Amino acid sequence: MTQDLSDKYYKQLIDLQDVELVEAQIRSLLDVPIESVSDLEKWLKDEKNLMIKIKEALTGHQVDFYRNTEDAEIKSTYLHDQQVIQPLLMKYEAKMNEKCCESPYFNQLDEKRYGLMRRVRESKVKLFREENIPLMVKEQELCTKYSEIMGGLTVDWDGEERPFPFIQSQLDHLDRTVREKAYHAMMSAHRQIKPDMDAIMDELVQLRHQIALNAGFENYRDYMFVAKNREYSVQDCYDFHENVEKHIIPAWNRLAEVFKSKLGVDTYRPWDNTAKLMKNPPYSEVSALMDGVSEMLGKTDPYFADRFDYMREHGLLDLGDRKGKSPGGFCTSLPVSGDTFVFANFSPSFFSLIALIHEMGHAVNGYLEFSEHGPIEDYQHRMEVAELYSHGMELLLLDKLDRFYPEEEDFKSAQREELRRAFTMLYGPLAGDLFQHWMYTNPKHTAKERDEKFFEISKRYGLNPVDTNGLEEEIGMSWAGTLHYFQVPFYNIEYSISMLGALQLLENYRKNPEQAVESFKKGASADYNQSIAAIYEETGVSFDFSEPAVKRMGEFLEKVIQDIH
């Protein structure tokens, strides 16, 4: 029986400090003879059982580090994983992929069950180059450095040192002077770390470009499309950018005029674009946040609340803000335990409430998948699917925001704010996607050119209706606050694609709430070996980001917002 080396929220069934043991267990798989289809299926099962043990330990160490970037022992464990274990895994993963793909029984595997796995393995064999391993290790080291810098970022606020998320939360404030003060404080903090951010990003762009060249690609963008096994093309992305600019941005401009009028301001500045019209914050203590979200989930479906309460009881939620904690929020799976963990570093605000609901969409999806199919492997976890259920959960709970905003006007404002967020998810991630297309197809760009391009794209999309006069430099450098550009490149457009699906789910919910919730659960527990389109269909929506689809959902969203007024 394997001993659990951890008393934490994750199971540590393999000692990653014992590198010889880890290597021996992986190598033993390579020595197994495969003489039939059933042998290959058993080999795949044994490989999965070993890999999920390793993955759970790696995930636990990573979450530990994000929870406390200043703990030397935790950091040492995490860096050992990045510098020693990950390179070992890359090397042996390539060997196992070759063994699998070269087997004469590989193409005899059942297409429905193994088709996606076959395509992913073939892509990985095509992409693998041993000379890229040290480059990828260096890439991870730079991402770790980014987390450390951002985790340690504090801002002086009224003579008190406050974590960066607290300052971000002040952008919600009803008082315009507070919002403007918070905006400039954030920009000042960005300016202080800008040289470090530029140095990290400059090196990341060059590393990633070299990784792509080594693998036989012209640029990192093209490499990543293969690495992500995308079910759409580069041209599809460019068309999506164009269609959103054509149909969503004009609607966003009209909506901005409404918000500007409600705020009673003559000019619509960046700190007005963040304002919330309801009383803030919606809670003061994390316990109150959890109590309220549990109720909202329970009113939507008892299973949703059951999973949330279970996570709360078992230490699978870390939601408060503190110094030394990595920025952002995420949900990650623990494949041996069959659990999910939600991490968030946000101060009390409307956004932190929505962020928790969003991550619980991921968590519910994870629990449903595990209960139906067991541990999901990385290749099955496509973000176009995952984000459908996180955005979908936000919109299924839209009519329950009165739990935090009991006064009618505040409740209406909160609903409008969530729908405004849906608008931002249609154009914001697309702007980030376009920015990265430019960065990685122009790898010799300078830091100054990068800032200028970011401002230009921001002005075309989210800041189109905003008066940015005199703030061009500050806005240009603000890309550095987005962890996706550093840690998960080209993980942007998935948010916008999935939001189109989530809006269809809301449309269905407004017609038949019970049926829409059942469709959510059906899709969230679907066989992930299917195509993205098939999983969307099981959820009762279409995987469609064509011009007619963008136009239709933009019109629907604008009408729903108008109906609330």
Identify the meaning behind each predicted range:
Residues 1-279:
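A well-structured
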Residues 127-128, 185-193, 230-238, 272-281, ...:
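Glycine- and acidic
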Residues 201-212, 217-218, 222, 255-259, ...:
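Long, well-ordered alpha-helical segments
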Residues 235, 258, 262, 300-303, ...:
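Inter-helical turn/loop segments and adjacent helix faces that build the functional surface
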Residues 242, 247, 380-410, 418-420, ...:
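Post-HExxH zinc-binding segment in Zn-dependent metallohydrolases
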Residues 262, 272, 276-337, 349-350:
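Auxiliary, metal-adjacent structural segments of Zn-dependent hydrolase domains
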Residues 271, 356, 364, 400-403, ...:
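C-terminal, non-catalytic "cap/extension" segments appended to globular domains
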Residues 344-370, 387-390, 395, 435, ...:
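Active-site recognition of the HExxH zinc-binding catalytic motif
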